[in-house]
Amino acid sequence: MKLRGLYAITDSQLLAGRFLSHVEAALEGGVCLLQYRDKTDDAARRLREAEGLMKLCERYGTQLLINDDAELAARLGVGVHLGQTDGPLTPARALLGRQAIIGSTCHASLELAAQAASEGASYVAFGRFFNSVTKPGAPAANVGLLEQARAQVKLPIAVIGGITLDNAAPLVAHGADLLAVIHGLFGADSAQEVTRRARAFNALFAS
């Protein structure tokens, strides 16, 4: 499949009490990839929530990825996103198979992106591009990096970090394939607004 469009990432605290309803609202608006991101140690809840997301993704034809847990991804038969502290990519590829989508966090480093590509990544993720609630201390990236990555890395490029409808367009214009969004999507007050935002993010790729 072509990896291009909105990359929605969940936040269990942000979505407390409205987890599946707001995720489904996003899927209604159109989501290319959905990442389940939960940093707690509650394995039973994480499995339950991931299974719920998998059912929704199957209904809407969206690819599900698990953040930082290749074993859970393998159990569900879905993809995984790995950060630089989550272990090497090669064992995850061996575990999940050739067809699985595996993403790699590359911060603001072309060297990390090249390494990820050589290890079998499906896409590389750069960021943060703007002030981020989720990762305030992450190294900053800029659109110049995107242009260099587009020329050097032959993989889809995801961008993350404080992305909203007000600042996303230049990232797409400079080569981003995937807009990875958490608060800019799920911070909406209503499910209807989540759907509207999802559609608006996707519209940036249509021009």
From Swiss-Prot:
Its cofactor is Mg(2+). It holds the Pfam family TMP-TENI. GO terms for cellular component: cytoplasm. Its EC number is 2.5.1.3. One of its GO terms (biological process) is thiamine biosynthetic process. The lineage of its organism: Bacteria, Pseudomonadati, Pseudomonadota, Gammaproteobacteria, Pseudomonadales. Condenses 4-methyl-5-(beta-hydroxyethyl)thiazole monophosphate (THZ-P) and 2-methyl-4-amino-5-hydroxymethyl pyrimidine pyrophosphate (HMP-PP) to form thiamine monophosphate (TMP). 2-[(2R,5Z)-2-carboxy-4-methylthiazol-5(2H)-ylidene]ethyl phosphate binds at S132, V133, T134, G162. It comes from the Bacteria. Mg(2+) binds at D68, D86. Keywords: Magnesium, Metal-binding, Thiamine biosynthesis, Transferase. Belongs to the thiamine-phosphate synthase family. Gene3D superfamilies: Aldolase class I. This is Thiamine-phosphate synthase. 4-amino-2-methyl-5-(diphosphooxymethyl)pyrimidine binds at Q35, Y36, R37, D38, K39, N67, T105, K135. Binds 1 Mg(2+) ion per subunit. It catalyses: 2-[(2R,5Z)-2-carboxy-4-methylthiazol-5(2H)-ylidene]ethyl phosphate + 4-amino-2-methyl-5-(diphosphooxymethyl)pyrimidine + 2 H(+) = thiamine phosphate + CO2 + diphosphate; 2-(2-carboxy-4-methylthiazol-5-yl)ethyl phosphate + 4-amino-2-methyl-5-(diphosphooxymethyl)pyrimidine + 2 H(+) = thiamine phosphate + CO2 + diphosphate; 4-methyl-5-(2-phosphooxyethyl)-thiazole + 4-amino-2-methyl-5-(diphosphooxymethyl)pyrimidine + H(+) = thiamine phosphate + diphosphate. Pathway: Cofactor biosynthesis; thiamine diphosphate biosynthesis; thiamine phosphate from 4-amino-2-methyl-5-diphosphomethylpyrimidine and 4-methyl-5-(2-phosphoethyl)-thiazole: step 1/1. One of its GO terms (molecular function) is magnesium ion binding.
